[in-house]
Amino acid sequence: APLHLPEWPERVNGGRFLERVRVLKGLLGEGDHLVLFPEVSLLERFLAHFPGATPYHGGLSGPVRERFFRRPRGVVFATYGGLLLPFTPRSLVVVEEGSESYKLPSGSRAFVPPLAELRARLLGVPLTYLSLVPAVEVLERKGFALPVPKPRLLLVDLRRERGFPVTGRALALLRQVEERGRQAVVLSARKGYSALLLCQDCGFRPMCPDCALPLRYHREGKGALVCHQCGHREDPPLLCPRCGSPLLAPKGPGVDWIREALAERLSLPVYRYAGDGKDDLTPLLEGRPGVVVGTTALLRGPRLPDLALVLLPLADGFLLESDFRAAERYHRLLWALTELRPGRRPLLVLQTFTPEHPVHRALEAGEVEAYLWQEKAQREALNYPPRV
């Protein structure tokens, strides 16, 4: 049933997926409405609950898109191309406005949500942002926060646990999945090897003195630490500057490394799912046990029906990207992972050198917005967008 809010909101966040579906039903009344999605996979998940809506995206044939473009009407579920449809909707809704997929794949550097806001303003129609985790840029908009179930979370401190890329504790949980005939997902930040210099004893990582972003390790020559934001360079230290440990080395297992390590330790079938190659997951979709090792492409893939465990062997690989939005993206990723299985939340296991990071603390507390306000304040202090 539709969930009707007392007044038209500028943003709605939180809740379970089906609650956000109910909110969207409450926002879409009679007449024409435009709903924008970052990806076709998410569009299709919502579309299953809106039989009267019409999809409009690049995955459709040219003749189908052309025919609808000439006479757009009704409730339209679209990717970014929907902004060009020649009609005046009664309202415009942007779903998951913080998604990186809203960045247009061209040299324009355009970002869809601000364009949607401009279109709504020019047409004089209301606009609502609907997402599990709000973008920092829309935090100050008036709206509603739906209650979010507390995640099932286990933080594994890599400064104390042994075993890499999978610790003994995580391996024991994977073997439980194996014994019970369930399914697991193992997520890596990269297809190959990342270049994050981390101390295995204290978790120290070199940061840029100017940008407060992690320095990336480049192997060429004698090696160098480079800031991908401003170009700052420095020599990598031989010992950890914080604790003096010699265990300072590049870390970051890629998909293939993790897959090989698990295949040696488990009798379950281990599948690969990344942007550059995807195994056939049909056996898993039929309910058979197994493990999928992949990148964030898994979030756009099919939902596994018996998913019990989601493991990030090096969660810091997502957190320490050389981009000031990395922590916000990581925060959004973790909450998205809690919804990988419809109806029941899987156990989320994070192997990390920084279990005390504010993103992890917010997830433990079940707080979606509190961390984002901290992030907003930090960006303002550094004059990062949306401050500039």
State where each predicted segment sits.
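Inter-lobe coupling/hinge segments of SF2-like helicase ATPases
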Residues: 2-74, 78-388
